[in-house]
Amino acid sequence: EDLSDVVYYADLSEWQEIFAVLCTYAKQEDFSVLAERLGQRLEDRYLHSVQLGTPALTDRKNVVLCYLAAGCLEKVMSMWIEEMQEEEYAIKSGNTQRDNSPYSAHAEALQTLMEKVVVFQHAVQYTDEDLQPPVPNDDGTVPVREFKLAPLYNYILEYVNVLAEQGLLVIALKFVALTPPAYT
């Protein structure tokens, strides 16, 4: 309970110390929940700074770190999608030394996002519950599913199209497997 109080009430300017305390003293079964809560507090602060028009990108990176440590793909996904959109804009704007056509910019930003997702899934042995078959109701009907990673699935399917257009069908099929069969 003491660690929970630290996460909930400690000054966020000391977030690194809070994180170090969690890494050192949190029980394994409590760590993810506490790291996620710390990430949520940091994300709230980050979103508040965005609303004020003064977003601190270091805050976003800190949020991502906490969510990664917690193994929360659902939470880190929104941050990565935001980064992907910024990367795509930077490429299109010509702020890089790369091909800045809209298609190339989007494909490159998508690839960066997919690399992050795949590395994350392997690093934390993430299991996507939405890839499991749905449990039928008592009457035998299958419930309508809401996919918590729907925004990510949309980008995965876009990436599948990019890969298929390049003739990389074997790789495209591996990415299709990262989306639920019932997802459309």
Spans of features found by a protein language model:
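Extended alpha-helical solenoid/arm regions of large eukaryotic scaffolding proteins
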Residues: E1-T184
